[in-house]
């Protein structure tokens, strides 16, 4: 008979690739609420979470679909939508008196200019205090959708490709070239809530 175990089975959520427990422990020991930002193909979800023994508690949340209700006509999974979702979350959090947090990026790799850091920048601009390095956040031009505008202008020469690429924008009545102005309009609307 064996005297000791040679193989230790990892926790279920680690096996499923959902949780990095070492990182989670470090975040929980900070004692601050966690800004959890998650991106899917078509949406951005941002939540301010607090630890509880029975399970994490959502203090404040924002979803990119809330932007549509406010009049946003762009795609809900791009960088401008991520920034606006973070701004909306930050505005809600500051109103609730939650001004301090720490970023929980989950299992996402820390890539410069990623949507998760656009959410972080939005929360910072709303007045939250979250430690981060400025070099990881995307340029202002990418956050407001100027890169989408430039691509649309480039693609405009081929009318068929332009209509295929930006069909949803055109369907909603927004020219992709007007995205930065539309972004600024919605940003002002969120800040004046």
Curated annotation (Swiss-Prot):
Biological processes, Gene Ontology terms? ribosomal large subunit assembly; translation
What CDD domains does the record point to?
A: Ribosomal_L18_L5e
Swiss-Prot/TrEMBL keywords: Ribonucleoprotein, Ribosomal protein, RNA-binding, rRNA-binding
GO MF term set: 5S rRNA binding; structural constituent of ribosome
An annotated GO cellular component: cytosolic large ribosomal subunit
Subunit relationships: Part of the 50S ribosomal subunit. Contacts the 5S and 23S rRNAs.
Job description of the protein:
This is one of the proteins that bind and probably mediate the attachment of the 5S RNA into the large ribosomal subunit, where it forms part of the central protuberance.
The UniProt family comment states: Belongs to the universal ribosomal protein uL18 family.
HAMAP family in UniProt: Ribosomal_uL18_A
Q: What is this protein called?
A: Large ribosomal subunit protein uL18
Species annotation: Methanococcus vannielii (strain ATCC 35089 / DSM 1224 / JCM 13029 / OCM 148 / SB)
